[in-house]
């Protein structure tokens, strides 16, 4: 089961206290439900509402703050003149007061953006980081050596202002491929950005808005739990709406925690959590040039150091990381371009989690399954076919498929089911921007895996026909 935990951020529309249809200027129509609105947070975040964050149930509580919830972290987002039009915040900075254990996960695209190449190098030579700078507007991908030099100059400038080493400043970019960052505008905005840093909820909210592009909602979440009897916090923010396909998606993410963990262990934990979350979402089958998740651990909670991946404290922290990243990942799929609902695929009965996850990802990625969900068609044949071509062997006479709680196929045989009820289930999910749950069993193994996607609508084509990637 999952709990819907809205993150409260203001939007710049008067008298909005119920579900509405919002249409950003210049965008084609996309309908969604606004789950939570507030009316008086700082101006920098007054542009788009926040996504509902569907975090798994567990021994944690959701708290305000996003990336600033954990001890030692500050953040802010401002308008720096980087976007092609409008004055939505487009430049964000997240900092840590101390040297934080640093980890990163990146795109598998061979045309990796300049900031991706830079971050990989920085993490190779430094175990720690102090800051993450994120810009929206230009991807700085396929920009050659000039684009890489832009990254170095930006990192040098931030490092000088914060009095840290260049390699302790990590950089993420999102926007139009082939365009270098507007370096002069960015550099001119940095003094204001650094001077505006805050540990407040508002700082986290403004940063989450600043990193968005075609997103209609910002994605930010934080939880509090206990490790060894000590309270620790894990927070995060992410962006993504299109070009969402494993590995990761066109997505950027920053994760923070105040747990104390050795860097080598932290990096293994972060990659595991990414594999269970951002690598399990899909919107359109495209893999971006800029995918990046940076995760920082300040160690300021007072918890004992985690030095082994197999110890109890590591297992507890891993569960918290998984919860935060899965919540953010699902909000990205929920916000898929043109989408009317989230699709969650759960697969059981394989020999391992990895095999189950691969089948789940195959089904969630299927354009035919996505189109059937949008058409409110309970087409179990498309689900079975997508499971079958995932590349994981199973006996088809073990195949079992449910749509919600409606059994469509069992023991590899189609069943007589209430088709109007199944169609209504899909229709209700679309009308409320809810979740369509597909359950698949392929055998008697203990492996369980999940993947998330969204339906495929006419609006997806319209949005991407009108937007320069």
Curated annotation (Swiss-Prot):
The record marks 249-250 as: Cleavage. Keywords: Acyltransferase, Amino-acid biosynthesis, Arginine biosynthesis, Autocatalytic cleavage, Chloroplast, Multifunctional enzyme, Plastid, Transferase. Disulfide bonds: none annotated. Its EC number is 2.3.1.35, 2.3.1.1. Gene3D superfamilies: ArgJ beta chain, C-terminal domain, L-amino peptidase D-ALA esterase/amidase. Substrate binds at residues 213, 239, 250, 337, 464, 469. Pathway: Amino-acid biosynthesis; L-arginine biosynthesis; L-ornithine and N-acetyl-L-glutamate from L-glutamate and N(2)-acetyl-L-ornithine (cyclic): step 1/1; Amino-acid biosynthesis; L-arginine biosynthesis; N(2)-acetyl-L-ornithine from L-glutamate: step 1/4. It catalyses: N(2)-acetyl-L-ornithine + L-glutamate = N-acetyl-L-glutamate + L-ornithine; L-glutamate + acetyl-CoA = N-acetyl-L-glutamate + CoA + H(+). The active site is at 250 (nucleophile). The record marks 174-175 as: Involved in the stabilization of negative charge on the oxyanion by the formation of the oxyanion hole. One of its GO terms (biological process) is ornithine biosynthetic process. It is found in: Plastid, Chloroplast. This protein may be expected to contain an N-terminal transit peptide but none has been predicted. Heterodimer of an alpha and a beta chain. Catalyzes two activities which are involved in the cyclic version of arginine biosynthesis: the synthesis of acetylglutamate from glutamate and acetyl-CoA, and of ornithine by transacetylation between acetylornithine and glutamate. Belongs to the ArgJ family. This is Arginine biosynthesis bifunctional protein ArgJ, chloroplastic. It comes from Ricinus communis. The lineage of its organism: Eukaryota, Viridiplantae, Streptophyta, Embryophyta, Tracheophyta.
């Amino acid at each position: 089961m999952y709990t819907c935990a809205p993150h409260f951020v203001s939007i710049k529309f008067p008298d909005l206290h119920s579900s509405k249809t919002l249409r950003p200027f210049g965008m084609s129509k996309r309908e969604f439900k606004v789950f939570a609105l507030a009316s008086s947070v700082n101006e920098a975040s007054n542009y788009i509402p926040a996504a509902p964050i569907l975090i798994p149930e567990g021994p944690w509580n959701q708290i305000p703050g996003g990336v600033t919830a954990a001890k030692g972290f500050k953040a802010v987002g401002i308008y720096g003149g980087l976007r092609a039009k409008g004055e939505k915040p487009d430049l964000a900075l997240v900092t840590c007061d101390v040297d934080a254990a640093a980890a990163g996960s990146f795109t598998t695209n061979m045309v990796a953006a300049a900031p991706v190449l830079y971050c990989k190098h920085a993490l190779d030579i430094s175990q720690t980081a102090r800051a993450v700078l994120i810009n929206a507007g230009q991807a700085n991908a396929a920009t050659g050596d000039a684009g890489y030099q832009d990254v170095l100059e930006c990192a040098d400038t931030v490092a000088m202002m914060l009095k840290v080493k260049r390699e302790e400043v990590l950089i993420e970019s999102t926007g139009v491929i082939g365009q270098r960052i507007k370096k002069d505008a960015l550099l001119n905005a940095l003094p204001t950005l650094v001077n505006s840093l805050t540990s407040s909820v508002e700082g986290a909210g403004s940063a989450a808005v600043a990193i968005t592009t075609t997103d209609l909602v910002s994605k930010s979440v934080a939880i509090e739990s206990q490790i060894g009897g000590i309270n620790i916090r894990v927070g995060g923010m992410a962006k993504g709406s299109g070009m969402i396909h494993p590995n990761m998606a066109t997505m950027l993410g920053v994760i923070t925690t105040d747990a104390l963990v050795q860097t080598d262990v932290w990096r293994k934990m972060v990659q595991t959590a990414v594999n269970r979350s951002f690598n399990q979402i899909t919107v359109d089958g495209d893999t971006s040039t800029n995918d990046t998740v940076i995760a920082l651990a300040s160690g300021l909670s007072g918890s004992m150091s985690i030095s082994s991946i197999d110890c109890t404290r590591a297992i507890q922290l891993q569960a918290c990381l998984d919860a935060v990243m899965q919540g953010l990942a699902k909000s990205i799929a929920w916000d898929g371009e043109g989408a009317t609902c989230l699709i969650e695929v759960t697969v059981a009965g394989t020999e391992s989690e990895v095999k189950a996850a691969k089948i789940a990802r195959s089904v969630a990625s299927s354009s035919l399954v996505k189109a059937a969900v949008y058409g409110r068609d309970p087409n179990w044949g498309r689900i079975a076919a997508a499971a079958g071509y995932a590349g994981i062997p199973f006996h088809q006479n073990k195949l079992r498929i449910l749509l919600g709680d409606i059994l469509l196929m069992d023991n590899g045989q189609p069943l007589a089911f209430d088709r109007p009820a199944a169609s209504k289930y899909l229709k209700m999910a679309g009308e409320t921007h809810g979740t369509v749950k597909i359950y698949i069993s392929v055998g008697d193994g203990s492996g369980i895996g999940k993947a998330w996607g969204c339906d495929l609508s006419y609006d997806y084509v319209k949005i991407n026909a009108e937007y320069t990637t």
